[in-house]
Structures are given as C-alpha cells and as structure tokens.
A protein has these predicted regions:
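Acidic, surface-exposed loops and disordered segments
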Residues: 1-113
Length: 113
C-alpha cells in the first residue's frame, strides 16, 4: 500500500470481533509502533498487551463508558504508556523547554497512529 493511500484511507476502528489475534500480529504492531520518531530518539513509549479475560475486564472497568463500550468485544488491548521525565528533558533532569513531558506524549501518539 502506498503511503498516501494509507494516510487517506486511515480510520478509527470502534468495533471489534471477539476472534483471537495471533501473538505474531500483536508483536508486528508493536514493532511498527516502535519505529515512530521520538524526541532525540529517546524512545519512551512502552506497550503492554492485555489478553487474559480477567485483565481485560479490569482494564475495561477503568475506561470511560464510550471507550469501554467500543472495546467490549476486543480479544486483546495494547496499552501504551510513556516513561516520564526523559523525553523533553536534559541529562541533568531539567526540562528542555516548557513542553517537558509533552514530547513523550507526542511521540506516543505518533506510534499509536
């Protein structure tokens, strides 16, 4: 698929099949996300695959109703977090500018696309 076509046809999926997803596909998604650019290549995004029914229910219980409803049939969730105080920060621990941790959140969003 050409990049332009992929960008133009991108959409947010809001309903899922309850069919299991092969671990290889989840790994491929995370590997692709890890290629996204980050501030000074700090690579602060972290990805966690949730696939056991008990953990899925625990995570769903924390979501706002709209999000909970959208993912109630999903057989797995990929949870994305950010290591704080690294991306957007200098080695001495001081933020580079007023955005501070915002750089990590920005990079996390890029990987989630």
């Amino acid at each position: 698929m050409e990049l332009q076509s992929a960008l133009e046809n991108r959409k947010s999926i809001r309903s899922y099949l309850s069919k299991d997803v092969e671990p290889e596909k989840l790994t491929a998604l995370i590997e692709a996300a890890s290629l996204a650019p980050s501030w000074k290549n700090s690579q602060t995004a972290r990805y966690y695959v949730i696939h056991t029914p008990e953990k899925l229910e625990q995570i769903r219980a924390t979501l706002p109703e709209f999000n909970r409803k959208n993912c109630e049939q999903a057989p797995a969730l990929i949870i994305t977090t950010v290591v704080l105080n690294r991306s957007g920060y200098e080695r001495n621990g001081e933020p580079t500018n007023e955005l501070g941790n915002g750089w990590g959140f920005y990079a996390c969003g890029l990987g989630s696309m």
